[in-house]
Amino acid sequence: MSDPSEGSLTPGELLVDDAPVELNAGRETATVTVENTGDRPVQVGSHYHFFETNPALAFDRETAYGMRLNIPAGTAVRFEPGAERDVELVAIGGDRIVHGMDGLVNGDLDDEATRERAMDRAAAAGYRGVER
């Protein structure tokens, strides 16, 4: 790391404390077992609402609602066809309003009517791991 007093900063460089940075401190977490039942690999990015991931991924979507992968920003997890693995999820922060993704939620994650509508949409669309 450059010493800012020496005037040798690199554009875009981050100056951080020497102490380790704890990611997602104090946020709710959950672990789900995910199986890729499809015939192609599926890659999921760090900030994607995990509930809305590819319908071929089989896991407890009820548990995953309102959560994302607990991995550093800008990274992803790849699920190979037929493979099963455990992943840790973390609660989405901020205002907890989700739009886009696969269009299942489009609203406030903490609103019970929005949650029920999202579960119904996922079940109707054939997402694996939704019990309805």
Curated annotation (Swiss-Prot):
Pfam families for the chain: Urease_beta
Pathway per the UniProt entry: Nitrogen metabolism; urea degradation; CO(2) and NH(3) from urea (urease route): step 1/1
Claim: Phosphoprotein is one of the keywords in the record: no
GO cellular component, one term: urease complex
Keywords from the named record: Cytoplasm, Hydrolase
BP terms from Gene Ontology: urea catabolic process
Record field: catalytic activity: urea + 2 H2O + H(+) = hydrogencarbonate + 2 NH4(+)
GO molecular function, one term: urease activity
Subunit structure: Heterotrimer of UreA (gamma), UreB (beta) and UreC (alpha) subunits. Three heterotrimers associate to form the active enzyme.
Family: Belongs to the urease beta subunit family.
Protein name stated in the entry: Urease subunit beta
